[in-house]
A protein has these predicted regions:
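Gly/Pro/Ser/Thr-rich low-complexity, intrinsically disordered segments predominantly at protein N-termini
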Residues: 1-183
């Protein structure tokens, strides 16, 4: 007699909405995942990076910047809370009353001890599948930001910027961030 194979429950947006408010959750390919609260170092980097991005976006009047926790509804089985995201002016209609209902132009995830696989593999695949044009992965321990651009439905590394370098965005023309001001 062979053991019974049990299928994993697939969660939906409706299930996601029933999760407790006191925890941060994400829904990736129908799997409900809890995300621990970020540590102070993570928040420090996030705040500085968001400030620089928001300053550029506001000055140039090209869209809006949001930070976590902010739900990004991609479909009924995929709801994420990127650390930072940018939506261009021509796509502001995806900003709903309760969440972002569509694909941001740029997503930034900051790696933490518990999120390496999720951010570098699961979310990278997910964002590519949903056509997020630019994806940054911030690696605090390395004091590095990897910038990826979407080409043929796959992310290609545009550049891995170190702390001593100036980050240049391929899609946000004119954006330059001195990484020594972030790390």
């Amino acid at each position: 007699m062979s053991p019974a194979i049990t299928e994993k429950k697939r969660y939906t947006y409706e299930d996601y909405l029933k999760t407790p408010d006191d925890k941060r959750h994400e829904l990736i390919d129908g799997e409900l995942l809890m995300t621990p609260s970020p540590v102070p170092g993570h928040q420090r980097i996030s705040g500085k990076l968001e400030f620089k991005l928001r300053e550029f976006i506001t000055k140039n009047k090209i869209g809006e910047v949001f930070d976590a926790p902010c739900d990004v509804y991609l479909d009924n089985e995929n709801v994420v809370q990127p650390d930072i995201l940018f939506i261009s002016k021509d796509r502001l209609d995806i900003i709903g009353e309760k969440n972002i209902q569509g694909v941001p132009n740029l997503v930034i995830e900051i790696i933490s001890e518990n999120s390496v696989y999720r951010d570098m593999v699961q979310k990278k695949r997910l964002y590519a599948r949903f056509n997020v044009k630019e994806y940054w992965i911030v690696i605090p321990e390395e004091e590095e930001i990897e910038v990826y651009i979407l080409e043929d439905n796959t992310y290609q590394l545009y550049c891995a910027y170190k702390k001593v370098e100036e980050l240049v965005s391929p899609s946000l023309k004119g954006l330059k961030i001195e990484l020594k001001e972030i790390f």
